[in-house]
Amino acid sequence: MANDKNEDQKEEETKTLQEKYDELLEELDSKNKELAKINEDLEKQKEETQEYISLSQRLQADFENFKKINEKKSKDIIKFANEPLIKNILDSYEDLERALENSKTEKELRDGVELIYSKIKDVLTKEGLEEIPAKGEKFDPFKHEALMVANDENVENGYIIDELMKGYTLKGKVIKYSKVRVCKK
C-alpha cells in the first residue's frame, strides 16, 4: 500500500510537473510570438526610417540644385539688368553713327545731334531719370554738393547761385549729386 501511495504521489507530481511544463511551453510560445511581432515591427520601423533617410537625402539634393539654379538666375539678372536700357539707347547710338557719317554741313550735324539728344533724354526719362533742380533752390546736402561758396547780394544766404554740374535721381534715388556754388554771407 505504501508503494501504491508512493506511486500515486509520483503520478500526481508527474501530472503537476507535466501541467507546469505545458504551461511554460504555452507561455514560451506566447513570448516567442510576441518577440516575432516585435521583430516584425522593428523591421517595419527600420524600413520606414530608411525611406525617411532616402527622402531627406533627395530633398537635400533637390534643395542644393534649387539654390544653384537660383544663384545662376540671380547672377544673370544682375548681369543683364541694364539690357532694356541698352536696347533703348542703341537706336540713338546708331542714329549718332549715321549722323556723323552722312552729315555734309555743320547744320545737318547739329540737327542730327539735337535729335539724338532728344531721343536719349526721352529714353532716360522713361527709365525714371530726373534732373535735380539746383539754381535758385535752397542748398540741400542730400541732393547738392557745394564745390564753391560766394557772396551774391541778389541771392539769399544758403541758396544756390550756380549749378556747375547737373545732378540726377533715378526713380527718386540720388545717383549723381548736383555740383553747385552756394551763397554764403
UniProtKB/Swiss-Prot annotation:
Query: InterPro entries given for it?
Result: GrpE, GrpE_coiled_coil, GrpE_head
Task: From the Swiss-Prot or TrEMBL record, state where the protein is found.
Answer: Cytoplasm
Where the protein is mainly located, per its record?
Answer: cytoplasm
Q: Which GO terms describe its cellular component?
A: cytoplasm
Which residues fall in a coiled-coil region?
A: none
Please give one Gene Ontology molecular function term for this protein. adenyl-nucleotide exchange factor activity
Tell me which UniProt keywords the record has, alphabetically. Chaperone, Cytoplasm, Stress response
- Subunit structure as annotated in this protein's UniProt entry: Homodimer.
Q: Could you tell me which PANTHER family the record lists for this protein?
A: GRPE PROTEIN, GRPE PROTEIN HOMOLOG, MITOCHONDRIAL
The entry's function note states: Participates actively in the response to hyperosmotic and heat shock by preventing the aggregation of stress-denatured proteins, in association with DnaK and GrpE. It is the nucleotide exchange factor for DnaK and may function as a thermosensor. Unfolded proteins bind initially to DnaJ; upon interaction with the DnaJ-bound protein, DnaK hydrolyzes its bound ATP, resulting in the formation of a stable complex. GrpE releases ADP from DnaK; ATP binding to DnaK triggers the release of the substrate protein, thus completing the reaction cycle.
- Family assignment? Belongs to the GrpE family.
Q: What is this protein called?
A: Protein GrpE
Species for this entry: Methanobrevibacter smithii (strain ATCC 35061 / DSM 861 / OCM 144 / PS)
